[in-house]
A protein has these predicted regions:
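Core SAM-dependent methyltransferase catalytic element
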Residues: 74-81
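Short amphipathic
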Residues: 8-15
């Protein structure tokens, strides 16, 4: 596992979930965070590599990093608004 400098306020496990469920769960989870909070989203769906960055851009959240592990992806998202 890659080391990251981000300390998430919440971790959302979306492994084995297909589009659009990871994006819907991400939207719900980020709505509960304070501004400046960091959400880590873990996904196995390859479509999430396009879907989650598109969602962050559309909603004005900040995608800090995408980490690709052997079996999953980790997205670090900072709540901006």
């Amino acid at each position: 596992m890659d080391e990251t400098d981000y300390q998430p306020d919440q971790v959302l496990d979306c492994r084995k979930l297909s589009c659009p469920v990871p994006v819907l769960k991400t939207k719900h989870a980020i709505s509960k965070l304070e501004i400046g909070g960091i959400l880590e989203v873990i996904c196995t769906d390859p479509g999430s590599v396009k879907d989650i960055p598109a969602w962050t851009k559309q909603t004005g959240q900040e995608l800090l990093e995408i980490v690709h592990e052997d079996s999953h992806y980790e997205f670090f998202i900072k709540k901006i608004r």
